[in-house]
Amino acid sequence: ARDKEIVPGAYVQYTYNWNDKLMIMAGLRADYSSVYGTFVTPRAHVKWAPNEIFNLRASAGKGYRATHALAENNYLLASSRRVVIDPDLDMEEAWNYGVSAALYIPLFHKTLNLNLEYYYTDFLRQMVVDMDSNPHEVHFTQLKGKSYSHTFQAEASYPFFKGFTLTAAYRLTDVKTTYGGVLRERPFVGRYKGLLTASYQTPLGIWQFDVTLQLNGGGRLPQSYMLEQGIPAWNSRYKAYEQLNVQVTRYFRHWSIYVGGENLTGFKQKNPIIDASNPWGSNFDSTLTWGPMHGAVYYVGVRFNWERL
């Protein structure tokens, strides 16, 4: 039974270190699952740091994951969609590749930190949550076709003056899966995300001010059904939106107090629940949420440092 699983395994690893400038690690793991049988997981990591300014990391390997359709996606039960789970769902299997570079550039007597990352995942086996083939159904099925994920991220951070640091980050994603024989964008995955953070702490460390501006890229929604008027019940895509968060903190000897606000731009997703007035009807769906459902939120709080008391 899948609710009981025994997984003994063994792992071997080899590490090569050359003057702390080049490090190579190769590993191989073998496991036996009482449910899924035997599987082997290779992994390799390389780190090259020729100087204090630059370092490069790369990794590659295979990964496995046991799936639990409803436990991982129980939010989908908050709709009128019929749930169909194929009996032949297998363990997920994928190859993972990644490379990252870090630069520490001296600039005007300070250090500019730059980080670049790229990751690629290629699924060989995957549990697909198909909400496209039938708008009134959610179908958990085995992957039949391609499924992959590309992620690129760039981040820069610089202390312009004492106590003030500005950080900017941008992430671009390309995630696609085969649904009903068609390779499509995965729903609810934003195409990009941008982040700009400014943080300032007064010279004595008494006050701290944090401001974060976040840009969330648009994405795809599952296939819609047609209303009687001949129009779709919801749009096929959602647009990008911005969010502004602010927090002010006052530090004391053993405690601190903070006040702030989230989503100060006041953005709210319009009509997040489909057919909300008829929760027992065949068209009710509260699972198509992709953005905040509340406007600006304000808060105040207190922190205690127990280690100093």
Predicted segment positions?
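C-terminal beta-signal and adjacent terminal beta-strands/loops
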Residues: G217-S224, T249-L309
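Gram-negative outer-membrane beta-barrel transporters
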Residues: N17-K21, L114-D122, Q142-S224, R303-R308
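Membrane-embedded beta-barrel scaffold of Gram-negative outer-membrane proteins
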Residues: A49, N55-R57, D88-Y148
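Residues on the lipid-exposed face of transmembrane beta-strands in outer-membrane beta-barrel proteins
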Residues: A10-Y16, A44-W48, V99-L103, A154-Y158, ...
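Residue-level signature of outer-membrane beta-barrel architecture
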Residues: T15-Y16, A30, T38, W48-A49, ...
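Outer-membrane beta-barrel channels and translocator barrels
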Residues: N19-M23, A49-I53, A94, I105-H109, ...
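Surface-exposed extracellular loop regions of Gram-negative outer-membrane beta-barrel proteins
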Residues: R2-S33, F39-R43, Y158, K162-D174
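Transmembrane beta-strands of outer-membrane beta-barrel pores
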Residues: I6-P8, L28-S34, A60-A66, N73-Y75, ...
